[in-house]
């Protein structure tokens, strides 16, 4: 399948649908962890309950700050509007907590059919969330597409048997080889779906 032919579109949230201006280096600094530490994976190894709660509180505050600062990525709102017009199902799969996710979605008016956070499905790169969405839509994973900006997103798609699309930014071009598709701007994908509509019509 080519871009514009997939029967459902699933998005990562931060760095994909929205720019939350998240600085994970700063988060690691706040936590006192080495730069580049995988946040949720390292948190799961913390055995001391007091330290776990301290770290979790810092992470949750960080996510809420991101939700309050988030803005639509260029072209994302127009793409979602077109997909809804064409009755193509849409979803969000994010590693964020539920309260921060919904604060962001409600503040920006982002509407999709399914939203799964790390409290609703195992966190990426576990493919369970993508498979849950595919099952809810009763569509084969191979006929859907997952769009994200990080290697976790691409690994999650691959594990689910779903095409993975890298949403490019200034720092993630080295993930190109892990992606089935690469997208520089949401207007490009919107055009693909517009052309599909004309062909079908």
Which ranges hold each PLM region?
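Compact structured core domains
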Residues: 88-89, 95
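Conserved phosphate-coupling serine/threonine residues in phosphotransfer and NTP-handling enzymes
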Residues: 16, 94-96
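A short acidic, glycine-rich active-site loop
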Residues: 41, 66, 119
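A general structural signal for well-ordered alpha-helical segments in protein cores
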Residues: 24, 39-40, 52, 56, ...
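Metal-dependent phosphoesterase signature
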Residues: 45-81, 86-88
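Asp-based, Mg2+/Mn2+-dependent phosphohydrolase catalytic module
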Residues: 1-7, 81-85, 98-201
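Hydrophobic alpha-helical core bundles mediating ligand binding, dimerization, or RNAP-core interactions
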Residues: 24-28, 60-63, 101
């Amino acid at each position: 399948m080519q871009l514009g032919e997939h029967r459902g579109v699933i998005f990562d949230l931060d760095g994909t649908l929205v720019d939350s201006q998240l600085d994970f280096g700063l988060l690691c600094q706040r936590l006192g962890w080495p730069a580049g530490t995988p946040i949720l994976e390292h948190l799961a190894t913390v055995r001391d309950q007091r330290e776990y709660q301290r770290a979790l509180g810092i992470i949750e505050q960080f996510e809420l700050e991101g939700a309050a600062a988030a803005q639509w990525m260029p072209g994302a709102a127009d793409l979602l509007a077109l997909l809804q017009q064409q009755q193509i199902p849409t979803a969000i799969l994010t590693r964020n907590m539920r309260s921060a996710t919904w604060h962001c979605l409600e503040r920006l008016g982002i509407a999709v059919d399914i939203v799964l956070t790390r409290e609703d499905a195992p966190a990426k790169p576990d493919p369970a969330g993508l498979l849950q969405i595919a099952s809810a839509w009763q569509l084969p994973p191979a006929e859907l597409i997952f769009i994200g900006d990080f290697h976790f997103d691409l690994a999650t798609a691959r594990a689910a048997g779903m095409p993975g699309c890298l949403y490019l930014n200034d720092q993630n071009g080295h993930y190109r080889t892990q992606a089935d598709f690469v997208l520089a701007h949401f207007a490009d994908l919107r055009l693909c779906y517009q052309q599909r509509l004309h062909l079908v019509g």
